[in-house]
Regions:
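Subset of outer-membrane beta-barrel
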Residues: 3-253
Length: 253
């Protein structure tokens, strides 16, 4: 990667059916176990335990053996606080290593994982803050002559507010993600983490059956603004229709 471009990009893969159905707009409406990823301050919105798991083929049009897994849980501790966590695993599949002459040196598997612990605390009736601490590890090769494994740590901090601008239907969130030291695979070049500064708002409408969400995420290393817009409408308590839009200049989406 060129200097200044972020590494450890698997940390920026956004999980969850709800989020992906809403253009990944979640910062200002985070209220379930996926708040451990999108905005840890949103964990204070929980009134009971949440658990979720997802598994998906990743980039199936390019390779047939990449897989992404995300496991998350969250629970209220007391009336004013909550804890949670998630585990992320990205399997890049099997690859063949060759020398400069094209001779095969053997096959190897590449994978990455992250273990995250979350905590949220209410400041007052309408406001809360949250923090994530995470350890992540990446192994891009498992060969005796190749040093391509590294691990590091990072933190996220978030804020969530109900009754924003004195509107009982308006919520607001802010989050700084993947703040930590860069990573190096032993080649002397250090890649920064995919740090983002995000702001989101949510609007409850249609007597609480609908939610409109808008996120603005500034990618620090790419110096690009990502816009996420989503809407959901609950036909019944646990069944919703969702639509979303995302504009990512750096990813050309």
């Amino acid at each position: 990667m060129a200097q200044g471009e972020a590494g450890s990009l698997f940390l920026a893969i956004n999980p969850g059916a709800r989020a992906n159905g809403m253009g990944e707009a979640q910062i200002g409406i985070a209220n379930d176990a996926y708040a451990t990823y999108y905005n840890p301050a949103g964990l204070s919105n929980l009134s009971n335990k949440h658990f979720s798991f997802m598994h998906t083929s990743y980039l199936p049009n390019l390779v047939d053996d990449m897989a992404y897994d995300f496991l998350t849980f969250a629970m209220p501790l007391r009336e004013n606080s909550a804890i949670g966590g998630h585990f992320t695993y990205l399997n890049l599949g099997d690859q063949i290593s060759t020398d400069d002459n094209g001779n095969e040196l053997g096959s190897f598997s590449s994978y990455m994982y992250a273990l995250n612990v979350s905590y949220s605390q209410k400041v007052d009736e309408n406001s809360s803050w949250g923090v994530n601490g995470k350890y992540f590890y990446q192994e891009l090769a498992d060969l005796s002559n190749v040093d391509a494994a590294t691990g590091s740590v990072a933190v996220d901090v978030g804020y969530f507010r109900h009754n924003a601008m004195n509107n009982p239907n308006l919520t607001m969130g802010a989050v700084l993600t993947n703040l930590g030291p860069g990573v190096s695979f032993g080649d002397g070049e250090e890649d920064p983490l995919p740090t983002r500064l995000g702001f989101g708002v949510g609007l409850s409408m249609l007597e609480g059956a609908g939610n409109l969400a808008l996120d603005l995420n500034y990618e620090v290393n790419d110096q690009a603004m990502v816009t996420n817009l989503g809407f959901e409408y609950f036909l019944v308590e646990n069944f919703a229709l969702r639509a979303g839009f995302m504009n990512d200049p750096s990813g050309e989406l």
